[in-house]
């Protein structure tokens, strides 16, 4: 069964998945999958994002019965996966990453808030059998990729849900 590599936009999923691909893992870019199959809905101009019908996404994915090691994308934890690895990043660092990419203020605020309140982690815990999290804030992408490999190999200590806490950022 596939593993979801998920997290708030900007935490490093795509960069880490490219490293894992070079290390021999079969990676599915979920955003590309959605685009190629016409599963992106209306574009929300204010949020600079596309709407996605999650039920339709799941049905199309299951129908295709793809065999991949890792599904990368901020919606990947909504698919039928045994394990979700949630990449996390300290909100101030995440905000700077998004600014450097030229993202709109509203999109930055929405995603930083989602990271602060553990939105993706909570969703993943509701939809996946096993969930682990990795704080990418001070790690190089290759180190994050190695942590993902540790989890795949069964070395999960220190990656349990709740090990990353941004509640101080809310004060």
Description of each model-found segment:
Residues 5:
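Hydrophobic anchor at the beta1->P-loop junction of P-loop NTPases
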Residues 8:
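P-loop (Walker A) phosphate-binding loop of NTP-binding proteins
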Residues 11:
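ATP-binding Walker
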Residues 14:
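Walker A/P-loop
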Residues 25-79, 163-165, 170-171:
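ATP-dependent small-molecule kinase phosphotransfer cores
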Residues 42, 89-132, 138-139:
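A glycine- and Lys/Arg-enriched "phosphate-lid" helix/loop adjacent to the NTP-binding pocket
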Residues 76-82, 125-126:
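Short loop/helix-cap segments at secondary-structure boundaries that form the rim of catalytic
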Residues 125-171:
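NTP-dependent small-molecule kinase module
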């Amino acid at each position: 069964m596939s593993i979801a590599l998920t997290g708030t936009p900007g935490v490093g999923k795509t960069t880490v998945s490219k490293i894992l691909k070079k290390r021999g893992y079969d990676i599915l870019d979920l955003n590309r999958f959605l685009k190629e199959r016409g599963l992106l809905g209306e574009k929300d101009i204010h949020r600079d994002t596309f709407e996605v019908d999650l039920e339709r996404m799941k049905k199309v994915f299951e129908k295709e019965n793809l065999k991949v090691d890792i599904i990368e994308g901020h919606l990947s934890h909504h698919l039928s996966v045994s394990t979700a690895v949630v990449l996390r990043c300290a909100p101030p660092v995440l905000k700077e990453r998004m600014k450097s990419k030229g993202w709109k203020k509203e999109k930055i605020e929405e995603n930083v808030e989602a990271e602060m309140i553990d939105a993706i982690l909570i969703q993943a815990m509701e939809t996946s059998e096993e969930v682990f999290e990795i704080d990418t804030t001070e790690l190089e992408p290759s180190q994050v990729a190695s942590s993902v490999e540790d989890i795949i190999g069964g070395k999960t200590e220190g990656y349990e849900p709740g090990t990353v806490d941004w509640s101080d950022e809310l004060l």
